[in-house]
């Protein structure tokens, strides 16, 4: 595939010749496709017009033939979840959570007022200098999905290298998830279990979230593939003040000419069983005109417009081709429709005096590898429209000094920045993570979820300080960890990454770290009654209010976690102790005793405890407790044991066996 982009306003003289080429080249291609997909159509007419071609192709895609466009179902990697509180959003709109797949890839879950039935997810790829320039704002580049959008993640991150391509660029890449067959439009009525109001969500709800919560400078580009290309142009014409650039990669930029409503209706029926009448009402209605890109092209005057399409010719195996396999027959036909409608749009733009960068290729079909190519070809135009500096469009960089030594094995990937100052040291961003250096610790590179968690906590500015190791494998082989000046972060695929303060790490270490009965941490250390509490798979580690750290495990930890027990017992004053027949643990105001036959029970310091002790504690006459110590209505306390009961009534001890 060669770059054949041209400025349409400078090529009006060629418009007639192009139209003839389309008629002579693209239409026969479509006719050939129609013969294979819809043989009945050719029997009905021996002289097919371009309108008939479109209708015939549409007939051919109503039996699941667009399934090939559906991205592979891939779950996003589980990451640390945060809960941003963003002020000033429209009523009924909030960010429920932000999940950090990596330190530069965040998945927002949003409560929408326009589509309140279920949360909406949006992926953000953060700018190169997001961390090194924490007070800076950045432009947005929106990339809309196609007809077969799935709910797990954007097709862009599954099928293209968009994440890697933009890693060294200073823009926020915005990737809505879902929207199958929606055209990212506000639908007239609910259909097929969905109440699509995508345009309102994107322009009135998502945009303020990015502005107020993710450091947007409100300069925006909107792009899309196939259905998303149509949507990108429509949204830009409806909201011209929001976007400086609009790009369509194989979009359908004429929705109302004869044959196109049939094609769109067929596509929606094929991709999920949707009714096009529920989207824009009856064919020919005002809503169809409002969502016809060619009819509204004049509203884009003064913006940078990029339109691209192949011509349906399969170029797999040819020199300079980006194709990764032979063309799908349906993909040939869909690209022909895209080419014809995009040409109509460009011709209408020429008539209106609206300049378009038209990239009509001499080959190419309706497939993701071509759209990845167009993404890279469109970027210089996007960057110009958004006023991005040369430095913000990519970087020339190299690691030096200690950081260069730390990343010499290549695991960190290519650099995205040069070394920059952070509190007390240096940092440098790489494709796969970030390297840190301080005079006290030396240089270490961090990757993956541990690096993302460290970044979320504040990196070197956090209480952890600088890393003192690279990522290491845990002895049990199940997880990974990194040591820091004041603690560690441990990760497994099931628990995620969690930081452990140094003193609590030492207490955990007395149980042989992750190999012991406590297992891995399952959450962060949180404030708890003047101290800290951190949950593990098999119990807890506590930092008491006087800065002592102890662990509580197993059935004793479950009892201690019951409502109201902390108020009775206070913090632990030591770790669990094994005794004949069971175990016990001492707390500020009492103990918890456990045995296999009795379970775990609470006894408080005081007269009952002393009376039981006088009879030999759990090894004596009464044995282990079989109930918690509780208050009695007569005024006093009572507790049952294996061999009796001890009560305190009005200050007097009563024993019964």
From Swiss-Prot:
| Cystine pairings recorded for this chain | none
Subcellular localization(s) per the UniProt record: Secreted
Q: Which InterPro entries match?
A: AB_hydrolase_fold, Esterase-like, LGFP, Mycobacterial_A85_antigen
Q: Which Gene3D superfamilies does this entry report, sorted A to Z?
A: alpha/beta hydrolase
| Secreted in keyword set | yes
Query: Would I find Transferase among this entry's keywords?
Result: no
Signal peptide positions on this chain: 1-43
Principal place where this protein is found?
secreted
One Gene Ontology MF term: acyltransferase activity, transferring groups other than amino-acyl groups
What are the entry keywords?
Answer: Secreted, Signal
GO CC field: extracellular region
Q: Which PANTHER family match?
A: DIACYLGLYCEROL ACYLTRANSFERASE_MYCOLYLTRANSFERASE AG85A, ENTEROCHELIN ESTERASE-RELATED
| Role description | One of the two major secreted proteins.
Instruction: Provide the protein name.
Output: Protein PS1
Q: Which organism's genome codes for this protein? A: Corynebacterium melassecola
